[in-house]
Amino acid sequence: MEHKSKRNFRITGALGLLFAAFTAIVATVDVSPIGPEQSSVGLAALNRFAAGLLGVNPLWYDITEWLGAVAVLSALGFAALGLCQLIRRRSLLKVDPRILLLGAFYIAVALVYLFFERVIINYRPVILDAGLEASYPSSHTVIAICIFGTAIMQFHHYLRGKTVWLVIMDSVTALLMAVTVIGRLLSGVHWFTDIAGGVLLSSALIMLYASAVSYVECRKKV
């Protein structure tokens, strides 16, 4: 278990460095004013090609907006589970560590979102409301992968031995995650690199959560 924990942390670090390197490339390589209001976009040739190929699809935008709400409701469900455990067990220390870590994980995801709202790498390829909006990394991609991905981890813990339910929940959750990410790309409200950056970032964050859970469980067995 200790070896697994160390391996997970190494993978987390590698994914984090990969995201940082990709972000640096997007911010500095082939930057051209191809966005709305002449906003500059990195890897402009690639992003222009993908945007021209996919166009803008309002239906997929609406679908992914609803799926984003489903992801948030899923997170609230696990928050409610933690609250129920706290009420029943009457001590924060008796709440399942993986649920406490999940709460910290959600906070970390929110902080990352706020950071990239301030530190803008790319603006959206379309203007949706009032003016330019931050687009990198795709927040819906990050939310979908982070929330649905960690939800699958909880199912594998709390539904152990219930094979049918586990298969159903895994399949539905993985489908929701995939449709959200692919649908967000097809919607045309993000550049291709926004989606790719979101996938890399959320992969690093999920591995960080998995590493923390593995570490805590390893410590408990010592």
Residues of each region from the PLM?
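Membrane-interface loops
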Residues: I34-E37, L83-I168
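Transmembrane helix-loop junctions and nearby membrane-interface residues
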Residues: A24-V31, A80-L86, L114, R118-N122, ...
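Lipid-exposed faces of alpha-helical membrane segments in multi-pass integral membrane proteins
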Residues: V70-A80, A104, A108-V112, S171-I182, ...
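Membrane-embedded catalytic cores of phosphoryl/pyrophosphoryl-handling enzymes
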Residues: K6-G13, A27, L128-V222
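N-terminal transmembrane-helix/juxtamembrane module of multi-pass inner/ER membrane proteins
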Residues: M1-S74, E117-D129
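Phosphate-binding glycine-rich loops and adjacent basic patches that engage nucleotide phosphates
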Residues: S5-A14, S74-A80, Y106-F115, G161-K162
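Membrane-helix interfacial "entry" motifs
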Residues: K4, L54-E65, R90, K94, ...
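Alpha-helical transmembrane segments of multipass membrane proteins
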Residues: F19-F22, V109-Y113, E117, T180, ...
